[in-house]
Amino acid sequence: MIAASFLLNLLIYPFLINLFRKKSVGQYIRKEGPDLHGYKEGTPTMGGILFVLIGLLFGVLSKENGVILTGAFLFFLIGFLDDFLSIAKKNSTGLRAYQKALLQIAAASVVIAFSQPETAVDFFGIKLEMGAWYYLLALIVIVGSSNAMNLTDGLDGLAGWVYISGAIPYWFFLKEKGFSENIIILLSAGVLAFLIFNSKPARIFMGDTGSIALGGTLGVVSVLTKTEFYLIVFFPILVVETLSVILQILSFKLFKRRIFRMAPLHHHFELLSWEEEKIVAVFTIFNLISSLIALEVFGVIG
């Protein structure tokens, strides 16, 4: 099914790109973003609709955990709604920040309620009992993962390659621990096909439809497999990108000074005159090295 997911995405994307161009399903660029992105205005977006739906289809066929599929679908719907509103309003603003946050919290709450996870966590081999506080942690992990992937999706190929570089090693890690959550690898196959059309110059963007779904699914899987903290080492770039935004906001609010030229961090490097391809390569390699080290440390390889 992994190969089928890749091939199906590969075959359909050219038709989807042409369809979206004809229907003017294009990206609107944030005016406060780097001036270098102006040429991307109008590039077809919502490309995540294909690899997510195909991933979910094969997930159903492979009898994937129903709660995971439900969570993935809910976050897909949130991203789709955000993109749809942006296109309908003909600007870069879809859902307002508070609306998106409320929907993400609601989706995460549904997942937590139906999964009824145990309240102990695996902190890199140390079992910690958190009691009722665990539900807050689970909420933060799911919503945070969703937003982190969304923040990372700012350069051609960046979110896709970061996802691939962490998701495939993470999947092997889960298999070693006895879990059979295949949605991670099914989505990876679709994202790999998508990247053929998303690498610079991108012919299509995944949009929030793809990024919010990918991040949300990672968070849901980590909660159901009790590997919440392991996301940090398999997806350190998501953590770094998110922290750069938080630190930038706090620094400006408290000291009226910015730490970075622009946040998330990939925009900072853009404004330092790094080429997009270089940023994507460096971030992907960093994420991959961290993931491979994690596999060796946790006994999966080596």
Swiss-Prot record:
The chain crosses the membrane at residues 1-21, 42-62, 67-87, 101-121, 123-143, 154-174, 178-198, 204-224, 229-249, 279-299. It catalyses: UDP-N-acetyl-alpha-D-muramoyl-L-alanyl-gamma-D-glutamyl-meso-2,6-diaminopimeloyl-D-alanyl-D-alanine + di-trans,octa-cis-undecaprenyl phosphate = di-trans,octa-cis-undecaprenyl diphospho-N-acetyl-alpha-D-muramoyl-L-alanyl-D-glutamyl-meso-2,6-diaminopimeloyl-D-alanyl-D-alanine + UMP. CDD domains: GT_MraY (cd06852). GO terms for biological process: cell division; cell wall organization; peptidoglycan biosynthetic process; regulation of cell shape. Keywords: Cell cycle, Cell division, Cell inner membrane, Cell membrane, Cell shape, Cell wall biogenesis/degradation, Magnesium, Membrane, Metal-binding, Peptidoglycan synthesis, Transferase, Transmembrane, Transmembrane helix. InterPro entries: Glycosyl_transferase_4 (IPR000715), PNAcMuramoyl-5peptid_Trfase (IPR003524), PNAcMuramoyl-5peptid_Trfase_CS (IPR018480). One of its GO terms (molecular function) is phospho-N-acetylmuramoyl-pentapeptide-transferase activity. The keyword Magnesium applies. It is found in: Cell inner membrane. It is a multi-pass membrane protein. Pathway: Cell wall biogenesis; peptidoglycan biosynthesis. Catalyzes the initial step of the lipid cycle reactions in the biosynthesis of the cell wall peptidoglycan: transfers peptidoglycan precursor phospho-MurNAc-pentapeptide from UDP-MurNAc-pentapeptide onto the lipid carrier undecaprenyl phosphate, yielding undecaprenyl-pyrophosphoryl-MurNAc-pentapeptide, known as lipid I. This is Phospho-N-acetylmuramoyl-pentapeptide-transferase.
